[in-house]
Amino acid sequence: ITFQGCSPARQTVITNAITRARADVRAAVSALPTKAPVSTFSTWFGVYND
């Protein structure tokens, strides 16, 4: 992922934050009692398409 006008250090921070957020989302999704909405959710956010 590249961000226009960001230093490499800032890009790393942003990328790491996104990675952590996606991991949190994965954990939340896997904790759901039903898997029915998961495919829609993951399609919207690309959660399972790294």
Curated annotation (Swiss-Prot):
Catalyzed reaction equations: Endohydrolysis of the N-glycosidic bond at one specific adenosine on the 28S rRNA
Ion transport in keyword set: no
Keyword terms: Antimicrobial, Fungicide, Hydrolase, Protein synthesis inhibitor, Toxin
UniProt EC number: 3.2.2.22
Main EC class the enzyme belongs to: hydrolase
Classification via InterPro entries: MetalloPept_cat_dom_sf
Gene Ontology process terms (BP): defense response to fungus; killing of cells of another organism; negative regulation of translation
GO terms for MF: metallopeptidase activity; rRNA N-glycosylase activity; toxin activity
Entry keyword Hydrolase: yes
Function: N-glycosylase that inhibits protein synthesis by depurinating ribosomal rRNA, and thus acts as a ribosomal inactivating protein (RIP). Has adenine polynucleotide glycosidase activity on the poly(A) substrate A30-ssDNA. Inhibits cell-free translation in rabbit reticulocyte lysate system with an IC(50) of 1 nM. May function in the defense response to pathogens. Displays antifungal activity against C.comatus and P.piricola, but not against R.solani, M.arachidicola and C.gossypii. Inhibits mycelial growth in P.piricola with an IC(50) of 2.5 uM.
Name of the protein this chain belongs to: Ribosome-inactivating protein lyophyllin
